Amino acid sequence: MRFFNVLVPVAVAALLTSAGGAPSPAADPALLAPPVNTAPGPEYADDTRLFQGIPGIERAANGRLWALWYAGGKGEGPDNYAVLVTSGDDGKTWSGPKVVVDPPGPVRAYDPCLWHDPQGRLWLFWAQSHNWWDGRAGVWAIVTENSGDETPRWSAPRRLSDGIMMNKPTVLATGEWLMPAAVWQRKAGTDAAHSHDLGPRSGANVMLSKDRGDTWSYLGQAIVPNRVFDEHMIVQRRDGALWMLVRAAYGIGESLSADGGKTWSEGRRSEIPHVNSRFFIRRLASGKLLLVTHNPPDGKARSHLVAHLSDDDGKTWQGGLMIDERAGVSYPDGVQAPDGTIYLIYDFSRTGDRQILMAAFTEDDVAKGQWLSPRARQRVVVNQATGKAAK
């Protein structure tokens, strides 16, 4: 794998999987690899940003934390870019932008994700689309082998598949990797020349890699009733079955696969209470499942982020640690350290306070529903944007 200190756009036509044949990157700027800025200037400073949210978090083997989200413009749209920051003191202080992915023109970078693979490499994923949504988008990634360094060297950007991937991949017992990549059930919101219709590929798609991420191929798809943006996550149960949870208008839909993700059961509404927003689920080192959802009194608001545990693969849930009860908190993502500490990141008030926040806690805190452990921390500010709109 080649690494660069300065990453420049390259054509990636050979990697494209769009329906009806791949147009040339020159004719479709969303297919061009964007510049990856490893020395962001003042134009990306906190005091320039009017909007930010949708964060992800990861932890290197030496304890270095990484946080990622997207910002740019006044909201979701063509001015969006992805921002990466880091902390070398367990989240007490955070750097300014270390990497910015900012495609030129009306192409945006959004819904980013961080993930350490089993080899210890840190992947930085993002979606790329012409304007807000072009009907196809695309999952892109850069990778580093030295995520413990404050300024790691990154690979050149690569387009992995169509769709949008904002949640971490799942490594199966076989060693295969599954990546959730959604094609939204929405008409393209851009001009006709840059609009696409992927037809039956619209859904909660699953991409497969058998070679540690070198190549990805379409494996299968689940469809749940009243799906919205999918934002699906997959866990492998102890019996080997795959359980997919999908964002839906009523909260969370679900589907099961007994053949490694090739085919999926008819989607249905799950029994997990939640609102129309992203959730987070992950298997912990203990074998228990951690689930973070919204549990507001009215059943609708993006408030009351709560963490629960399951020791029976999601049949029942115990505990209940209130992460943040305020209106406007959303989009949790998390990672567990070897010492058992769970780091959770989420956003608060994307166009108001514009905060990216972190919490740290343990399984015992979740089980008891209280912030008891010495490692427990609430509402740690990772970043706050302070830009002011021009009058």
Residue ranges and their predicted role:
Residues 1-5:
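Positively charged n-region of N-terminal signal peptides that target proteins for export
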Residues 24-391:
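Asp-box/BNR beta-propeller blade signature and adjacent active/binding-site loops
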Residues 6-18:
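Bacterial N-terminal signal peptides
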